[in-house]
């Protein structure tokens, strides 16, 4: 099982009101310059919110939620400090998230 950490908010807030693109660009540049593999993903309408243990989060962001998921708890805590109005939490899952499993293509 892998522990995934997440920051959760409404899609409108994260995609329209916050400089999320800038945050991700800076983070990706940092990872690339340090030869680290990307360990975070932006997931609209995350299915993990349907788990019974996640009901409190689903109630906080009931419609059109979006999650930033990572295996790095420090990054998620940093996002909470950087962005502010997000819920943070964690869950365990046997799913292995990767560029391949999410069909992510690097654009050059």
Swiss-Prot record:
Keyword Plastid in annotation: yes
InterPro entries documented for this protein: Ycf54 (IPR019616), Ycf54-like_sf (IPR038409)
Entry-linked Pfam families: Ycf54
Keyword rRNA processing assigned: no
Keywords: Chloroplast, Plastid
Location of the protein in the cell: Plastid, Chloroplast
GO CC terms in record: chloroplast
Assigned protein family: Belongs to the ycf54 family.
Name of the protein in its database record: Uncharacterized protein ycf54
């Amino acid at each position: 099982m892998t522990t995934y950490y997440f920051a959760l908010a409404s899609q409108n807030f994260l995609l329209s009101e916050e400089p999320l693109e800038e945050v991700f660009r800076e983070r990706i540049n940092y990872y690339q310059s340090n030869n680290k593999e990307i360990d975070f993903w932006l997931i609209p309408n995350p299915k993990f919110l349907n788990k019974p243990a996640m009901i409190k989060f689903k109630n906080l962001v009931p419609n059109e939620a979006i999650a930033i998921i990572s295996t790095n708890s420090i990054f998620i805590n940093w996002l909470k400090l950087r962005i502010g109005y997000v819920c943070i939490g964690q869950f365990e899952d046997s799913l292995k998230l990767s560029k391949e499993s999410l069909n992510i293509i690097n654009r050059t």
